[in-house]
């Protein structure tokens, strides 16, 4: 999957290779007064207003660039050859500020023409329409209510979630449809949504799992 498949109005580029660095010599950008820029020219793979690149100069987000996109789809089917114990996943973000050096998902950033090292840690793609898109996909006649796994590629409760708050809407959409789901995280921010998770568990199967990075209490 490349940058163009992340947006719902990509119509200005001839090829995925035009997803070049927005700071390139042929690119221009306009600021909107909020620390955001919108790429135009050859960098504008997504069409007018389809992607916003944003940096936020606060301690918790320093060094991180957010690429806000409107995704075309959210529920992903796991390839049949996979040995994963689930068939469907949801990832509202791409890239992860947890910066785990062992993360197997790093190579997926290459599909977006982004760096798989530091870029994976600091260039975060945010699917800003994730909750509304999930509601639409769960309501589709072809959807059978299968289990959805989250946190399989990147952590849904990484630092970006503190700003964008996509997970409450996602959990609510799953609860409304009584659709079973699971979450894998190492982020304590999941506690913010404990009430929502409890409500969802009252109507469907909900499971959470936690990745423990160290047993050293002083680390």
Residue ranges and their predicted role:
Residues 1-89:
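Flexible, acidic/Gly-rich N-terminal and inter-domain linker regions that tether
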